[in-house]
Amino acid sequence: WDELMQLEYLMNKFGDRDLEVYLIHAAEWNVMGHKRMTERSVVLTASESGTTPEVLEAVKKMKEKGIRVYAMTKPEGPIGQAVGAENCVAMASDHGSGGCEKGYYLADCFGLRLLNRRGCFPKFDLFIEQTKDVWKDMLDIRKRFEPRAEELARKYALADYTMFIGSGALWGETILYSMCLLEEMQWKRIRHITSHDFFHGTLELLEPGVPVFLFMGEDECRALDERVRAFLTSGVTGDEDYVIIDTAEYAIPGLDDDFRVIVSPWILSVLTTDRLARNYELVTKHNLKYRRYYHQFDY
């Protein structure tokens, strides 16, 4: 769900005015449906385990309605079997083990290719060419960020409560890291909020000793992030525990300017879902694979 938010953003950014793109939660679709979904619709879903019950139920219903469904999942899993192996591509990574940027890459290639076929993203071939060797750059970014990841983990991994702020193309990754990695895998108490919503109540929760992470991207919403940064650095709250992570500081050389916004969630994933989470794990001594309830029994 949160991993596909950036794709919804990109398809709306680069698509034409007649293109309809919706990000729908499978559990909600199972009980509410969606009036704009027809047999002419194309659906992309994802399941790391291949068994997510809400997704499996939704996929089966969609197939019965004649809707075209593609999945990033194990072809041999229940969801893969429901979709059909020919419409599946195996997930290239899993949360907590690094490499989530590869999942972004696969989803982006799918969505941007659809746009290209509509005449909306003419630079698709250039995008593929310029990102084919991006994985070395991602490794370099990991190495460059590692000392800071170690420092941040030592300082904040044991905090009672932490706030995360993001926007635009980075909002999905902001949720993924704070909820899936820190809440689910580290059992940390977290608040995630968009840069535009931050000033509608959440700002009142800032006080000395509350760590605040601001993730800054390279899209139109950067102006909203800048407003948050100005507030955090003003000193008015007395809270000096703010962290600003700006994907522009880790820009990949040789990329067309139009592609920087596309790869910004990949970069943030490398920094947070991979390296920062791993360093939190070392400090908390809490294995990222520990679960009390998730996948432990039916609920």
Task: Indicate residue ranges for each PLM-predicted region.
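Anionic-ligand anchoring segments at beta-strand to alpha-helix junctions in alpha/beta enzyme folds, i.e.
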Residues: 1-39, 157-200
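Glycine-rich phosphate-binding loops that contact phosphosugars or nucleotide phosphates
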Residues: 1-124, 130, 215-242
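A generic structural motif
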Residues: 23-25, 73-74, 189-197, 239-251
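Short glycine-rich or small-residue beta-strand-to-loop segments that form or flank ligand, phosphate
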Residues: 42-46, 161-168, 211-215
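Glycine-rich, charge-decorated loop segments at or immediately adjacent to ligand/cofactor-binding or catalytic sites
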Residues: 76-88, 201-205, 250-260
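Active-site phosphate/pyrophosphate-binding segments
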Residues: 95-96, 112-195, 288-299
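Internal helical hairpin/lid segments
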Residues: 172-242
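Phosphate-moiety recognition in structured ligand-binding domains
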Residues: 228-299
